[in-house]
Amino acid sequence: MSHAPFSTRRTLWALALAALLALGACAPQNNLPQYDLPRPDLEAFRTRFIEPALPASGLAVRASLLYSTPTRANRTDVQLYGEYARPLRMDVRAGIGTMLALMREDSAGLLAFYPDKSRAYAHSDPVIGAQLLGLPFPFSLRDLAMVISGHFESLVPGEPDSIRVLPRGGFAFSYNQGPVRLLVLDQYGRPESMEGPLSKYFRTQAERDGQPVSGKREWTLKFAAYPEDDGDPAGPARRLILLLPKGDSAVLRVRAVEPRQSWAEKSLALALPAGAHFMSLESRPAPVTASDVITGGGDNAEQGHENAKPGSAS
């Protein structure tokens, strides 16, 4: 009977140990309780993501957004700041720092200004206005601010209409009405994904290129990178992944979320410069050059394209 040399056995042991360490690094490192029944799982979600009061009256978010289509990708830097109760501001910059868009959401709706063209657009419905301008997330800036902060009360209905057990653990809760029609929770009561109908006002890059979308037009928003899985204190997901029809996707990587009290009114103002061309979106769509700022469908030099590979930020 022959035996492998000691050096070979030592190498095999080292490889096995490295594999075990890699598996351990990939597994969630949290001490949260797990739930095997849907009702306790849903209650854990409500206790953590619905019922707590907001930490402050406002916030300041720094994030990067990668919008990908099957043929291109566009990366921008995003700052979202202001009061949860509005007004809220969002500034969008190219990766090289060039300001692409300035937006303000308040009780009057959404106002957006594009400095390079000196053009402004407005709509009384902030959700419709944002989607006409190419923002991929299917809800208002306020709802986006809430979700980034780990608060879902403005989107998720109270009582599900049906419940499904998932083979991998966790549960899927379906709703017949509201912006969110499906909420998937993991076994810790944390949002894993949400689904809902896509507004007729938002068009994917394929649709803007003239390709029809067959079947249901739906969006799926996945949540990843919870800080407690890395041994940090529990907090909101730091990566939001939006999947859209025809292969479009948007990945929002949250770099920082800071609670802020009582923003000064002038800090949230959006004054248009003299000579800016203004256009209401109430009865006509935004021009393609405006909606391409986020999706990168226009001139790459203008839109801050960084040669990112589609799908590279999953």
Specify the residue positions occupied by each region the protein language model found:
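Hydrophobic lipid-interacting interfaces of membrane-associated proteins
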Residues: S64-P70, G95-G97, A108, K117, ...
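N-terminal leader/targeting segments and the immediate start of mature chains
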Residues: C26-R75, S283-S314
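Bacterial N-terminal signal peptides that target proteins for export
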Residues: S2-L15
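C-terminal low-complexity, charged extensions that often adopt amphipathic alpha-helices
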Residues: H123-L166, F278-D299, N307-S314
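An acidic-aromatic
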Residues: P87-D143
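Gly/Pro-enriched, hydrophobic low-complexity segments
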Residues: D161-V288
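Edge/loop elements at the starts and ends of beta-strands within beta-rich repeat scaffolds
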Residues: E51-L59, T71-N74, Y81-R86, L166, ...
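Bacterial N-terminal signal peptides
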Residues: W13-G24
